[in-house]
Regions:
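Structural signature of hydrophobic alpha-helical transmembrane segments
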Residues: 173-185
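The feature identifies polytopic integral membrane transport proteins across all domains of life
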Residues: 12-23, 45-53, 113, 144-150, ...
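Juxtamembrane boundary at the C-terminal end of a transmembrane helix
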Residues: 221-231
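Cytosol/matrix-facing amphipathic helices and coiled-coil assembly/linker segments
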Residues: 1-16, 71-153
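Internal alpha-helical transmembrane segments
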Residues: 1-70
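Small-residue-rich segments of transmembrane alpha-helices in multi-pass membrane proteins
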Residues: 159-160, 208-221
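Interfacial loop-to-transmembrane junctions
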Residues: 189-214
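Core segments of transmembrane alpha-helices
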Residues: 27-32, 152-162
């Protein structure tokens, strides 16, 4: 009779969740800080909006480029390691089997059973067995550079749109408090949601994200105000 594993572990979603949260958080903080900094320097309303729009595009493209390069490098490294394993298997299959069995012994399996497991796994897919258990490379989660780039860019754009739309809607006289308030609210919601999905404290998650967002906005607004007086 088949046994189904019904548990849904949070680690299964932590990868995409972390990327989405980081992207949206970066979009909110960077764009809100830019808008507040330019507004504090006494720029015109249209100038503030243009700066925010430029920040959204620049942030999304920067994140997309960074993710693409990072994940592509990971994919290149994994391919090189798998190619090296394939050469090792061709040169010394017995030695590679003993190496794989040693990994299982280190995990607590009886040596004789570990050797049998290694033998059967290598008979089924020798390269896959070594890639998974020796190198930690999973065929279920291959690196996808384009997907990672688009996901990160989208998350940044969605996050950045919140303070930007606020800056577009509210009048210039109320821009700074409204943008700051809306951005901090969304940061708190984002931090709390991510903490809840990851099984952590919602309050701590919300406070952590909000604190660093508020700090970034305050510093940028202060710098903008300073240069606004000097210029």
């Amino acid at each position: 009779m088949a046994i189904f594993h019904r548990e849904q572990h949070r680690m299964q979603r932590i990868g995409w969740l972390r990327a989405a949260v980081l992207g949206a958080n970066d979009g909110i903080v960077s764009t809100a800080s830019l808008v507040l900094g330019v507004a504090a320097a006494h720029a015109t309303h249209s100038g503030v909006v243009i700066a925010g729009a430029a920040g959204l595009v620049a942030g999304a493209m920067s994140m997309a480029a960074g993710e693409y390069v990072s994940v592509s490098s990971q994919a290149d490294t994994e391919r090189a390691d798998v190619a090296l394993e394939r050469k090792g298997l061709s040169a010394d299959k017995k030695g590679e089997m003993e190496e794989l069995a040693g990994i299982y012994v280190g995990r607590g399996i009886d040596p004789a059973l570990a050797m049998e497991v290694a033998r059967q796994l290598m008979a089924h897919d020798s390269v896959g067995a070594h890639a998974r258990d020796e190198l930690g490379i999973s065929a279920l989660l291959p690196p996808r550079p384009i997907q990672a780039a688009l996901t990160s860019a989208g998350a940044v754009a969605v996050g950045a749109a919140m303070p930007l739309l606020t800056a577009v809607i509210v009048p210039a006289a109320s821009l700074i408090p409204f943008v700051a308030g809306v951005s901090l609210l969304f940061l708190a919601l984002l931090g709390g949601l991510a903490a809840h999905a990851g099984g952590a404290s919602v309050t701590k998650g919300a406070l952590r994200v909000t604190f660093w967002g508020a700090l970034a906005m305050a510093v940028t607004a202060g710098v903008g105000a300073l240069f606004g007086r000097v210029a």
